[in-house]
Amino acid sequence: MERIPSAQPPPTCLPKAPGLEPGDLPGMDFAHMYQVYKSRRGIKRSEDSKETYKLPHRLIEKKRRDRINECIAQLKDLLPEHLKLTTLGHLEKAVVLELTLKHVKALTNLIDQQQQKIIALQSGLQAGDLSGRNVEAGQEMFCSGFQTCAREVLQYLAKHENTRDLKSSQLVTHLHRVVSELLQGGTSRKPSDPAPKAMDFKEKPSSLAKGSEGPGKNCVPVIQRTFAHSSGEQSGSDTDTDSGYGGESEKSELRVEQPYFKSDHGRRFTMGERISAIKQESEEPPMKKSRMQLSDDEGPFTSTDLISSPFLGPHPHQPPFCLPFYLIPPSATAYLPMLEKCWYPTSVPVLYPGLNASAAALSSFMNPDKISAPLLMPQRLPSPLPSHPAIDSSALLQALKQIPPLNLETKD
């Protein structure tokens, strides 16, 4: 019979083969094959963790439900009473949540309205009218209302002359009546009426004061030139005008008064003629002239200075009295050019009006030593330019005698 080798035990004489270790086989690594095998201890631990997880999950769910119920109970307590009365019976959880949602929406709408009102107030608009009104429109409305109130007060006070008997209650009732008429749209009073006589009431005290004073009380006496007919008065008036008082402050007051003034003789003359008689001082200092300009103007005195100067200027209403050429004798015409340079700045001097001394004038031309003091021309202030030296009269006459006389024929 044949034996089955699997049923027979191995012979004991054969030695046991030693186990192979990884270090015995060089070049071969079996470390990656070790991970395939798992220990039974890890499997047992995972099963134990599942069993232990079920217990805390139940506790967590229980706690979560408890928190939900507690929050719903608090919402139920916080709901207003009018919302609780809308439902009958017990308030379920779903009903409490619905009422809470409704109440929150109402509060949100209210907050939105309040925000709009706050924005309107910050931008200067009225709470009821949020369309196109700006700050300027509000200011104009305030000013128009104030003007209307002031106009009514002034008109009411103007009707009652005796203000002592007037009471404040009467004025208040009058203003209330006017406001009611304006609100009703009465045609008798319109806010667009012309402004009242407010300015008239304000200007009445000042106008009355001016009227009581009269035109002459505001006038201050101004030092003016008085054209006298005698030499003594004329010499005394020269010192008055040189006092340095120019009357600058009175010019503005005189311009406010009447444009025409009456003189002592009843003649009317304008403001310009009256101011021309007042001494005026130029604001800018006079410009210095060179010698060439001085020779062109014929010495230190010019014809324009003599005409416009207050010393030799004629009366504004009387023509100047000039000495004609035919009154000068032929003998004087010979040395007349020298007299122009030495004594007289112009060939024809201007005399004061009303001077009844034609013969005296001729004698003064012939004899310069006998010229009276009032008829002498005033000298200007000393200028830096060199002036012509004065010549003695005796030396002048001797020099003139040596000059041959010119054959000049004059008219009758």
Swiss-Prot record:
Any one GO MF annotation of this record: DNA-binding transcription repressor activity, RNA polymerase II-specific
Name of the protein in its database record: Class E basic helix-loop-helix protein 40
Covalent link (Glycyl lysine isopeptide (Lys-Gly) (interchain with G-Cter in SUMO2)) residue numbers: K167, K279, K288
Gene name of this polypeptide: BHLHE40
Recorded superkingdom: Eukaryota
Lineage: Eukaryota, Metazoa, Chordata, Craniata, Vertebrata
GO CC annotations on file: cytoplasm; nuclear body; nucleus
Residues covered by region (Necessary for interaction with RXRA and repressor activity against RXRA): 75-79
Main location, first listed in the record: cytoplasm
